[in-house]
C-alpha cells in the first residue's frame, strides 16, 4: 500500500470556496489510484484554505503525470463554483509534484490537471500526456469559438453577453463591483445635475468642468489652464493618449501646400521652412484615415468629422508647436490653411477640429483596434491553441486576464447599435465600422513593434518624447524576460518550427486578427527563436504598456471637453472669417453629449480594484527555477525603470506617468 500526501489550495476570494464533494485520482507512469474523496474534519474548501489529505493506492504509481479532480454534489447543498489555486502531491519517496489550476471549476464535472513542468509538444513523450494535450485543445476549441462581429475587422470571441461568458473570463467580484458601481454613480450624478437632459450648447467654457467638480488632478487642472496654448497642443502629440501618430516630415505632401510666407512669422527670421525640413525639426500629423468616413445625427442634428493635416515644428527649446492646419485632404479655395497668426478663436477652432479628429482616430484605431480587439485575438488564440502545460501559455495567460470580458462589455454598451457611439459620437456605429476597416488595412507589424515604429516614423531624436523614452525601456525589459523564457524551451530554430501548437497559435492570430493580410508584415509562421522573442514581446507590450499609454490619460486630458470633442456640430470653416466664442460653443458638443462621453471615460479609467501591475505574477504557472529567476530579474528591471521615471518627473511641470510600471496593468482589462 502506497500513501500519497495531497495538498489542495483554494483561492482567496470571498466566493472561492465550495461545499461540493471533491475527489481526486492520481495518474502515474505505472498506473492510477482509485478515486478518493478529499474529506477531513471541518470545512474543507473554504476561501484561502490550504488542506492536506492522504490518498491511498494499492501500488506505487511511479512519477505522477496528471491528476483528476472530481466535483460532485454534497448532501442537499446546491452546486457552488470553486476556485482552485493548485494541488501538490508528495509521493511515498518524498518527491513533490505540482499541478497548477488557477481557475474556477463550475458545475459537476471532472477536471484533469497536468504536472506543472512546462513542455513544448516534443517534450511530452508519454502517450498519456500527448493524449491529454490533444483532448484539452479539443475541449478549448469547442469552448472558445470565433465570430465575425464587423466584416473586415478582427474576429472576436463568440460571446453575446458578459453574464453568459465562461466564468473564468469574467471580472472578479471586486473589479465588477467597482466598475459598475462607478458607472452608476457617475450617470446618477450627471442626471441629478441635469446635464444628461440638456441637448443645448454650453453657455460658457467655465461651465464645462462642473460636470465633474469633485475630480481634480494636476493634469486636469493643467488642461483647463493651458488647453488653448500651442505648446500644449503640440505636447499632446508626444505625451498625450495618442502618441503614435506624429512622424518626421522631410518633404511637404503635395496636398498640403504650406509656403515659407505662411510660416515665416512662426519660424522667425533666423531660419526657413526648407532649412527646418532639412534639419529634421518639422513633423506631420495626418488624419487621412478619416477621409470620407460617414457621420450621423446626434440630438437631431447632423454631425461632422474632418480629415486634417497638421504641420508641427520642434523649437530649439524642445517645445513642439503647430505651424499650419488644413482641415481636409483636398487643398483649394474652400479648404484654407489656418495659421497661428489668424484671429484667436479661428485658430482655436482649427486646433479644436484637429483635436476632434484625434478623438476619432485615437478611440477607434489606436485604442479600440490596436489595444482591445488585438488583445482579444491574442487571448482567444491562446485559449484555443496552447494547452496549459505549454510554456507560452504560462507566459501569456497573465497578459490576457479580463481582456475578453471588457470587450464583450464594449460590444454591449459602447459600439453596439444604439450604444454610446450612436448617441454621442459623430461617426456613430456606421462610421466606426468603416474606420476600423481602414485602420486594420493600414496596420503593420512595424507599427506594433515599438523600436521599429519609432524608427519608421522618424521620431528617434524628438526631444521630450517621454512615451518613446519610457516605452523603449519597457519594451527592452519585456524582450529580455521573453528571450530568457524562449531560450529555456527552444534551443534550436527547428524546435520553434516543429512546435505545431505554437505555429497554430501564430497562424490563427494572422487569419483571425489580421485577416490573412500579408501586406501587414505580420508573420503567419515563426522560424527562429529571435522571431519568436520579438513576436511575444509585441503581444505582451500591446496588452500591457501600449494599452496603458492610450487608455490611462483619456479622462484627465478630456475632462475639459474642448480639448477632446467627440463630435462637431457644424462643418469645418471654409474661409477665414472671424469666429466668436458663441460660434465656437455652438460647434463643439452639447451638454448632454459632453456629459455622456465624460461619464464613459470616467468609468474606463484605470481600475484600482484587483489590478495587477506589469510583471506581477501571483499565480505560479511556472514552477521551475529558471523562469522564476527571469521573473525576478524582470521585476527588478521594472523597479529600476520606475525609479528613473520618478526622478525625471520631479523636474517636469506636467508629469508623464502613463508608462510608469506600477500604473501599467498586465493585461487589457479596462
Regions found by a protein language model. Give the residues of each.
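Long, compositionally biased charged/polar stretches
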Residues: 1-670
Amino acid at each position: 500500500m502506497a500513501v500519497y500526501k495531497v495538498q489542495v489550495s483554494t483561492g482567496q476570494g470571498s466566493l472561492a470556496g465550495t461545499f461540493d464533494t471533491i475527489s481526486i485520482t492520481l495518474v502515474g507512469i505505472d498506473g492510477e489510484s482509485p478515486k478518493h474523496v478529499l474529506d477531513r474534519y471541518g470545512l474543507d474548501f473554504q476561501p484561502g484554505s490550504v488542506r492536506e489529505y492522504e490518498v491511498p493506492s494499492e501500488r506505487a504509481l511511479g512519477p505522477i503525470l496528471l491528476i483528476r479532480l472530481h466535483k460532485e454534489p454534497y448532501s442537499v447543498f446546491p452546486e457552488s463554483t470553486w476556485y482552485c489555486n493548485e494541488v501538490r502531491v508528495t509521493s511515498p519517496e518524498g518527491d513533490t509534484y505540482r499541478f497548477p489550476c488557477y481557475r474556477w471549476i463550475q458545475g459537476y464535472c471532472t477536471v484533469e490537471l497536468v504536472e506543472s513542468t512546462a513542455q513544448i509538444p516534443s517534450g511530452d513523450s508519454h502517450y498519456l500526456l500527448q493524449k491529454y494535450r490533444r483532448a484539452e485543445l479539443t475541449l478549448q476549441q469547442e469552448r472558445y469559438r470565433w465570430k465575425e462581429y464587423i466584416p473586415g475587422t478582427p474576429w472576436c470571441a463568440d460571446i453575446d453577453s458578459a453574464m453568459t461568458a465562461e466564468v473564468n473570463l469574467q471580472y472578479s467580484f471586486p473589479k465588477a463591483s467597482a466598475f459598475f458601481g462607478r458607472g452608476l454613480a457617475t450617470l446618477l450624478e450627471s442626471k441629478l445635475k441635469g446635464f444628461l437632459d440638456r441637448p443645448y450648447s454650453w453657455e460658457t467654457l467655465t461651465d464645462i468642468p462642473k460636470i465633474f467638480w469633485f475630480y481634480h488632478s494636476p493634469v486636469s487642472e493643467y488642461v483647463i489652464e493651458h488647453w488653448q496654448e500651442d505648446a500644449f497642443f503640440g505636447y499632446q502629440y508626444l505625451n498625450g493618449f495618442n502618441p503614435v501618430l506624429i512622424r518626421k516630415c522631410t518633404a511637404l505632401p503635395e496636398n498640403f501646400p504650406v509656403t515659407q510666407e505662411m510660416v515665416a512669422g512662426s519660424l522667425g527670421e533666423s531660419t526657413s521652412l526648407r532649412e527646418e525640413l532639412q534639419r529634421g525639426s518639422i513633423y506631420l500629423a495626418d488624419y487621412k484615415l478619416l477621409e470620407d468616413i460617414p457621420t450621423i445625427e446626434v440630438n437631431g442634428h447632423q454631425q461632422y468629422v474632418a480629415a486634417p493635416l497638421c504641420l508641427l515644428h520642434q523649437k530649439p527649446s524642445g517645445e513642439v508647436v503647430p505651424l499650419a492646419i488644413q482641415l481636409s485632404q483636398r487643398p483649394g479655395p474652400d479648404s484654407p490653411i489656418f495659421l497661428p497668426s489668424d484671429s484667436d478663436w479661428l485658430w482655436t477652432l482649427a486646433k479644436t477640429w484637429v483635436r476632434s479628429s484625434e478623438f476619432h482616430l485615437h478611440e477607434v484605431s489606436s485604442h479600440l483596434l490596436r489595444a482591445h480587439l488585438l488583445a482579444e485575438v491574442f487571448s482567444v488564440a491562446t485559449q484555443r491553441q496552447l494547452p496549459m502545460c505549454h510554456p507560452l501559455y504560462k507566459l501569456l495567460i497573465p497578459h490576457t486576464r479580463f481582456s475578453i470580458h471588457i470587450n464583450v462589455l464594449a460590444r454591449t454598451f459602447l459600439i453596439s447599435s444604439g450604444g454610446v457611439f450612436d448617441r454621442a459620437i459623430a461617426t456613430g456605429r456606421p462610421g466606426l465600422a468603416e474606420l476600423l476597416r481602414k485602420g486594420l488595412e493600414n496596420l503593420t507589424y512595424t507599427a506594433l513593434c515599438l523600436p521599429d515604429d519609432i524608427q519608421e516614423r522618424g521620431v528617434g531624436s524628438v526631444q521630450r518624447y517621454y512615451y518613446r523614452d519610457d516605452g523603449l525601456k519597457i519594451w527592452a525589459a519585456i524582450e529580455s524576460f521573453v528571450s530568457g523564457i524562449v531560450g529555456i524551451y527552444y534551443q534550436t530554430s527547428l524546435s520553434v518550427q516543429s512546435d505545431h501548437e505554437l505555429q497554430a497559435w501564430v497562424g490563427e492570430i494572422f487569419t483571425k486578427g489580421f485577416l490573412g493580410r500579408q501586406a501587414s508584415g505580420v508573420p503567419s509562421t515563426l522560424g527562429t527563436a529571435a522571431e519568436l522573442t520579438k513576436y511575444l514581446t509585441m503581444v505582451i507590450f500591446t496588452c500591457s504598456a501600449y494599452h496603458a499609454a492610450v487608455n490611462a490619460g483619456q479622462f484627465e486630458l478630456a475632462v475639459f471637453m474642448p480639448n477632446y470633442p467627440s463630435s462637431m456640430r457644424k462643418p469645418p470653416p471654409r474661409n477665414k472669417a472671424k469666429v466668436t466664442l458663441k460660434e465656437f460653443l455652438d460647434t463643439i458638443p452639447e451638454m448632454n453629449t459632453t456629459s455622456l462621453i465624460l461619464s464613459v471615460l470616467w468609468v474606463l479609467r484605470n481600475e484600482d480594484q484587483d489590478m495587477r501591475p506589469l510583471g506581477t505574477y501571483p499565480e505560479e504557472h511556472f514552477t521551475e527555477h529558471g523562469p522564476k529567476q527571469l521573473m525576478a530579474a524582470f521585476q527588478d528591471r521594472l523597479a529600476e525603470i520606475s525609479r528613473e521615471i520618478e526622478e525625471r518627473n520631479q523636474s517636469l511641470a506636467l508629469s508623464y506617468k502613463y508608462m510608469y510600471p506600477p500604473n501599467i496593468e498586465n493585461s487589457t482589462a479596462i
